[in-house]
Amino acid sequence: MKLTCVLIITVLFLTASQLITADYSRDQRQYRAVRLGDEMRNFKGARDCGGQGKGCYTQPCCPGLRCRGGGTGGGVCQP
């Protein structure tokens, strides 16, 4: 009888602690996703692109342009 009561109390305690922990971690993930989205939006590589005639050795070309050339100095963004 005592063992049964101890087991029931233990199960209730573990269930309650898991519910509390799950509720806390769910909120943390939500904030983490928002923070990661902000970091992706402000990432320097995501913002900068080379316009027509600009070098594409250190940064990618803007949409609609391709990196042409090469050699020792790198390529140039051209349509």
From Swiss-Prot:
Residues 23-47 form a propeptide. One of its GO terms (cellular component) is extracellular region. Residues 1-22 form the signal peptide. InterPro entries: Conotoxin. One of its GO terms (molecular function) is toxin activity. Its main location: secreted. The keyword rRNA-binding does not apply. It comes from the Eukaryota. It is found in: Secreted. Disulfide bonds join C49-C62, C56-C67, C61-C77. The keyword Signal applies. Keywords: Disulfide bond, Knottin, Secreted, Signal, Toxin. Expressed by the venom duct. Pfam families: Conotoxin. The presence of a 'disulfide through disulfide knot' structurally defines this protein as a knottin. The cysteine framework is VI/VII (C-C-CC-C-C). Belongs to the conotoxin O1 superfamily. This is Conotoxin 12. It comes from Conus vexillum.
